[in-house]
Amino acid sequence: MHSALTDRQRQDAYQRMQNGTAKIAIGTRSAVFAPVQNLGILIVDEEGERTYKSENAPRYHAVAVARKRCQTHHCPLLLASATPSIESYYYAKKGVYTLLELKKRYRNMPLPEVTVVDMNRERQLGNGTPFSNALIDAMQETLSHGKQVLLLLNRRGYHTMISCCSCNEPVYCPNCSVPMTYHKVSDQLMCHYCGHMQPMPETCPHCGGKQFRRMGFGTQQMEEQLQLLFPKARVLRMDADTTGSRYAYEESLQHSAQEYELWLYADDWKGLDFPDVTLVGVLSLDQALFAGDFRSYERTFSLITQVVGRSGRGDTAGRAILQTFLPNHYVLQLAAQQNYPVFYEQEYAIRKTMLFPPFCDLCILGFVGEKEEIVAAAAAEAVRQIQVYVKEQAFSYPLWVLGAVPCHYERLKGKYRYRVILKCKNTSPYRTLIRAVLEAVTAQKAFAKLYLYADMNGDIGV
């Protein structure tokens, strides 16, 4: 079950589950609602994956829904991951969950050897390309032995940003407060948030300058450079630009195991299993460490660990090369060592000190509208209403209020976005407060046209 099913296919799948013809249901996030009648076990694979959280209404987390379903059906819930979420591992350590550990890798193969390459040193040696000398040599050796290479670069496009040479301002999307990305195939700038496309401007919209610098590198440029470095190797680029059609992703995977030697990915690698891949290269993940969310370290550690694990899954031992300008950062070092227990202890200490989940819940009160001054006023009014409620209702539970402030991306798809973040608990008294505050704000005529929402433990880095 997945979003690509037609209405007819989805109806057929639901009927097969309801009448018991289908004994096993497999699917993406929404499959947690599958109408299985006699539920015996519910398995959430890669339970720490961020896509299990719906950021649009209805806002829910598939793991929370799975937990409730298993309580209702009196059956076990299995949360599986090589890199569990900090919250899940915390509950396992406390004994709320039962912790089951796999001590050996599949087929008893050794973990890949990971080399961390300091890209600052590469620049000092005059190497201005995105590929370190160590990675180029390793790719050449791997290809010469008839094996395959996987490369990760989580940035689409050709150049990641275009800026003016006179004022240094980027070219922003007219609908979003986000710099646009240059795509060479279409020779256009594209916003990866709203999809807006436009040609390169002749003059800077900020100062009128006529010269621009093209900065950063994306998967399109990497594909081009790989073809120059290894002209005999067949390169497969997989990102949202090449796998946008309904079956393109599956078709690419079906052919890639036999037809390509170099694979370039821009997306998540979890679950991929290709026995001839003996080298994995992470081109750049430094920016992911500073994504504006308290989960940034966790997600970076998880992605690197999962990527490294794609190497050496066959009969030949694998290796991985991690390129970074932050070679001494503890997250990158522990990810290279694949040392989750030590990483957990580090993250545990930070979250306990800063009071982040699992030591509290975060409720994001969101305010969205076309006029910034009205959106900002609504967010400020929500803070005032919280203060009124706490005083009038003698609210004695611990509560921390952060904001009102603009969201990480203040404007998306033509709408301004502000938020108030509450550090609280997802319990009835807090939910009553949140409901009362939102109702008090929406009751005011000035804010009637705004979109307001409450999102428990959502992504604050957007």
Predicted regions span which residues?
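Short helix-loop-beta junction
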Residues: 227-233, 384-392
